[in-house]
Amino acid sequence: HVHEIGCWDNAHGYDGSIPGWGQRLIDTGHRVESIGKLHYKSADDPTGFSVQHSPMHLKQGVGTVWGAIKEPFADLPEPWRMFNKIGAGVSNYNLYDRKSANAACEWLKARAASADDKPWVLYVGFVAPHYPLVAPSQFLDMYPIEDIPLPKLHPKDGYKRHPWVDTLDGVIGQDHFFNRDEERLQAIAAYLALCSFV
């Protein structure tokens, strides 16, 4: 459980010091491998994978400490905008996810052709849906903004959020970067497109 391992936000990466499901499976003789994003502290830690193929972990083992769930929240030194680019295109994260998906398909084909019938686990991690909100056009075209409703529970419409959510929004909130509802809808469409992309 997250309260036992202390990894409940993007600030604290899992380091394997408390055994997880992967270690337990390895201990029983199972083959356990990963392809793609894990977002753990380091590939060098005993996180429960016999092999990590093209892993993505926390940069230098440190997460977004400023966004940690703590009292009080840290102040950001400058406005932090995650929506610098929204719309059709191909980001480096999209390329990474495609590479991970292709590697997983090849891994599964090789496994199917193997005579080894021992149990195995393959975990495949993707970055999407994640900022930047950029998706290949064939996926973005699936979500015309005129068909997307605006969020129902929005403070600009009088909705009262939980105080904790208000505090978090004051630290890393992004909605105030949008000048128009059309921009909000473009962001929602791009997010949905990234979900379909995955």
Features from the language model and the residues they span:
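Formylglycine-dependent sulfatase
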Residues: 1-198
